[in-house]
Amino acid sequence: MRKLYIASAISALVLSSLMFATPSRAAECIIAGELSPWGTNSTGTFMLPSGGSCVLNLRIPGVVNSSSVLQKPAHGSLRRVNVSNYEYRAGKGFKGTDTFSVTAVGKTAAGMTGKSVVTLNANIQ
C-alpha cells in the first residue's frame, strides 16, 4: 500500500509540473543566406505565416559582444531575447514582405573585432 501511495504522489507531482510548465520559445527561423564575417553586412530571407513567430540567431562566427535593433519591422514586432537572439512576430492578418535590421558588434576567434548589420526580409504568407 505504501508503494502505491508513493507512486501516486510522484505521478501527481510530475503531472502538476507538466501542467504549469512555461511554454517553450518560438521555433528558430530558417534563414536563406549566410552571415558574413565581422565587419561585413549580411542580408537574409525567411518565410513565416501571418501572426507566426520565430527566433533569429545571429550566428556570426566568433563572439557577439553587443547587438541592437537598427530598423524596426513595419508590419510585425521584434524582441531581443539575448545578445545574439531576437524573436520576430509577424502582424496578424498581414501578408507580404517585412524588413528589419539588427546591428551586432563582436570579435573573431583570432581577436579581430568588427561591427555588422544584418538585414532580414520576412516573407509573410
Predicted regions mapped to residue ranges:
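Cleavable N-terminal signal peptides
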Residues: 13-14, 24
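Sec/Tat signal peptide C-region and signal peptidase I cleavage site
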Residues: 20-26
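C-terminal edge beta-strand
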Residues: 27-29, 108-125
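N-terminal edge beta-strand
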Residues: 27-43, 47
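Surface-exposed or secretory-pathway low-complexity segments enriched in glycine-proline
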Residues: 46-84
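Extracellular/luminal low-complexity segments enriched in Ser/Thr/Pro
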Residues: 85-97
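A short beta-strand micro-motif common to beta-rich folds, especially ectodomain repeats
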Residues: 95-108, 116-118
